[in-house]
Amino acid sequence: MAAAVVVAGEAAAAAGAGGKKRGASRSWILFDAAGEERVLDADKYAIMHRVDINARDLRILDPLLSYPSTILGRERAIVLNLEHIKAIITAEEVLLRDPLDDNVIPVVEELRRRLAPSSATQHDVEGAEEDESPFEFRALEVTLEAICSFLGARTTELESAAYPALDELTSKISSRNLDRVRKLKSGMTRLNARVQKVRDELEQLLDDDDDMADLYLSRKLAGAASPVSGSGGPNWFPASPTIGSKISRASRASAPTIHGNENDVEELEMLLEAYFMQIDGTLNKLTTLREYIDDTEDYINIQLDNHRNQLIQLELFLSSGTVCLSLYSLVAGIFGMNIPYTWNDNHGYVFKWVVLVSGLFCAFMFVSIVAYARHKGLVGS
């Protein structure tokens, strides 16, 4: 493995800029087909000149700008913007932006391992399958595997934190648990959008054979070198899968494979389908988690409705008791008026009867109200 060498930005690419301000230099790491790696401290003009892309495509890779996940096929390069992985892949080299970023370092290590030249003692049979794959597909596979693994790991972390929090919330509804679940739900929504975008990008590529054909850089390079193609053309694309994926469309499985045919995208299709299934599985996990959160919310709402109904029942009992006591107080108020009447003369026993009858009547009235409410199903039994 060659040691990393710092290479100055290519000044010739910006020679025609005149007095214009040069773009800010950015750190890139370059891996070529021979397994050599270099660190490039190049500005955008140097990168555009090196890989033959326009400024709009390069702007997609700017970490300061918010662009969705994108895989673009150009004449001489594949432009990749997958979350933190921002790369440009050509038929002979791959450039990865910000190689010192914590999330990018594992991608650099994997590229260093997968793109390293084969050892002299290695059997040809062991490396035949990998050697037959074009360089751009090996680099593309590393980036897809990295982003799928990254999003899958984030999903697993979210699941390990969300399910216990949701179970705790169902057992005890508190402000702390509600706030915890709210934060987890917000994180799940953001992660779901990121996974969905990567999945949609892969699905869009799989649905368009022309877009997949644009990613065959080695084939286009060989076609440019040999305009006349025939049966003796370069065999870049074997029919056997290179990534262990056995998924293929029935229409292509039944048709004979013509190597070098510009419409033959079976190898790339198998590559993309494998990681499409992986990212789709991650999205299914997030969908299951979202459904679990929705079920938990429904359960909590049912509990809250039950508590609300209990409070309404209590309010009904208290209101009924208040009405009965008000009638009892009305009787006391009537007899407390300073109006002459004969009951006050030698009829002391009447006081006992008035108090007793009024109390029994109010109690009977309260019981009747409660019984009527139970009969109509307004309160629980």
From Swiss-Prot:
InterPro entries: CorA_TM1_TM2, MgTranspt_CorA/ZnTranspt_ZntB, MRS2-like. The chain crosses the membrane at residues 316-336, 353-373. Keywords: Ion transport, Magnesium, Membrane, Transmembrane, Transmembrane helix, Transport. It comes from the Eukaryota. Magnesium transporter that may mediate the influx of magnesium. Belongs to the CorA metal ion transporter (MIT) (TC 1.A.35.5) family. This is Magnesium transporter MRS2-I. It comes from Oryza sativa subsp. indica (Rice). The gene is MRS2-I.
